[in-house]
Design a protein with these regions (language model features):
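His/Glu-rich zincin catalytic helix
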Residues: 1-71, 176, 189-293, 330, ...
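Short amphipathic beta-strand starts and helix->beta connectors
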Residues: 11, 71-76, 180-192, 297-304, ...
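M16 family metallopeptidases and their MPP-like homologs
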Residues: 15, 23-43, 60-116, 152-175, ...
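Short, polar/flexible loop-turn hinges at active-site or ligand-entry regions and domain interfaces
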Residues: 53-56, 97-101, 120-129
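Acidic/histidine-enriched alpha-helical segments
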Residues: 64, 120-144, 231-239, 335, ...
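Short, flexible, solvent-exposed loop/turn segments with mixed acidic/basic and small polar residues
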Residues: 80-82, 189-196, 305-309, 403-407
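Glycine-rich, mobile lid/loop segments that gate access to catalytic sites or pores
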Residues: 140, 144-148, 159, 163
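Short, low-order "capping/linker" segments at domain edges
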Residues: 142-146, 242-256, 359-368
Length: 430
């Protein structure tokens, strides 16, 4: 299932997969911009604000009511991170053409709705609607204040800031509360105009309409005429030899331990499949070393897992522990990592990781949204690969390659959120 790549207008690009495999179709439009302290929060707020109302549908209720009339179609604006880049866009999902009379089906109408969202927002007095903005600013404040209510996420975020200090990856996309008041309707309107008139987007479509017809339709209905493509570059490097350490206290029963590792292996590296296998074996599943050995056999923690970011080159380990178990848990995690360096992987761990990676690749082929993320991410990095090819790459990974990938990882930061309450005093959802 390989996408056809076409030009839309003079500068935009379309990745299109023509298939009748799915009952629904998907159309995505995405901009990639560098993550910067000055603009990250404003972009995040802008893409929440755009869904509040458009020229034809001045309220959010009217906009989504019309989507409901289109066989319960949906459009979701988003703002997320990919390495040092900030991805801004919207995804439309709608019933396939063969279920609504054939031809292009709902695709023309969904292009019009995306055009309303991105090109024709509600602009009374030629500016984004100030009352909508104030409402979204209040919501953003609440979101920022609520970070502390997710101790596990807070610990990981603080570890990320330590490990990538001074780099775009350390920035929070939602920003800090102190900078919200300075955001104005006039300023956000200018940011929206700059985005939609200077930058060229990438489109992704999966459905039954021929790619050439989709490209022509997009050129007519979504004339995003920007001629600039931001360089999608991400700084990739190993950390210094010194491991950074920091601790905070919070009224919790548990302690939250976060350990960050950096690597020079990213999605385009030959060892990327091996690094994915490494993460699966290390702490990526219930059959991993961290779960079975640190949590189950030694009962050192309430939870212990790892996550991998191949856009940036990072692995984060997160664990919820009794405060008094901090030192022994840290050492236990390092012991499991050292086992990977030596290539000590049991048959059970190896087989479980192979099956898990194979399942993920097969599952991709059944999910239009997952296929969109897969192809858009690789296109952004100049990688030509299909899920079938990635599946074959996982099948070919050897234990020696996993050990080699482990040698490219280096611990760089440890953050500990120290709980100050006795058992029974805290929130059971910690």
């Amino acid at each position: 299932m390989t996408p056809q790549i076409l030009r839309v207008g003079a500068h935009a690009t379309l990745l299109a997969v023509q298939t009748d495999r799915f009952k629904s179709e998907l159309l995505n439009v995405q901009f990639a911009v560098p993550t910067k302290e000055k603009t990250a929060q404003r972009y995040a707020l802008l893409f929440e604000l755009l869904r509040r109302g458009t020229e034809r549908y001045p309220t959010k209720a009217q906009f989504y009511r019309h989507l409901d009339d289109l066989y319960a179609s949906d459009i979701r604006p988003y703002c997320r991170r990919a390495g040092d880049m900030q991805l801004l866009g919207a995804t439309a999902e709608f019933l396939g053409a063969r279920f609504v009379g054939g031809g292009a089906g709902l695709l023309p109408e969904m292009c019009e709705m995306l055009a309303q969202l991105l090109l024709h927002p509600y602009l009374p007095n030629n500016e984004l609607h100030a009352p909508y903005l104030e409402s979204e600013k209040r919501h953003l404040r609440d979101t920022i204040r609520a970070r502390i209510n997710n101790p596990r996420g807070y610990a990981r975020s603080e570890c990320r800031k330590m490990l990538f200090a001074g780099e775009p990856y350390a920035l929070s996309l939602s920003g800090e509360e102190e900078s919200i008041d300075a955001i104005t309707a006039k300023g956000l309107t200018a940011l929206w105009q700059e985005l939609t008139t200077t930058l060229s987007p990438t489109f992704f479509y999966i459905g039954n309409t021929p790619p050439e017809a989709v490209a022509a339709l997009l050129e007519r209905t979504l004339p995003l005429a920007g001629d600039q493509k931001n360089p999608t570059k991400t700084l990739v490097k190993m950390p210094a030899d010194t491991v950074l350490r920091r601790e905070e206290e919070m009224p919790l029963c548990q302690g939250k331990l976060a350990i960050g590792y950096r690597t020079d292996i990213t999605l385009a590296h030959r060892l990327a499949p091996a690094m994915s296998m490494l993460n699966e074996i290390f702490g990526g599943s219930a059959a991993s070393k961290l779960f079975l050995n640190v949590r189950e056999k030694r009962s050192l923690c309430y939870h212990c897992s790892s996550s991998l970011d191949l856009y940036k080159g990072a692995i984060f380990v997160g664990s919820g522990i009794r405060v008094e178990n901090r030192a022994v848990t840290e050492q236990a995690i390092r012991t499991e990592f050292e086992a990977l360096l030596r290539g000590h992987i049991t048959e059970t761990e190896w087989d479980a990781a192979k099956r898990s990676r194979d399942f993920v690749c097969r599952q991709l082929l059944d999910q239009p949204a997952a296929l969109c993320d897969f192809y858009m991410g690789r296109h952004m990095l100049g990688i030509s690969e299909t899920p079938e090819q990635r599946r074959a790459a996982f099948a070919a990974v050897t234990r020696d390659e996993v050990a080699e990938a482990a040698s490219h990882l280096r611990e760089g930061a440890v953050f500990f959120l120290k709980g100050t309450l006795d058992d029974g005093e805290g929130d059971e959802n910690e």
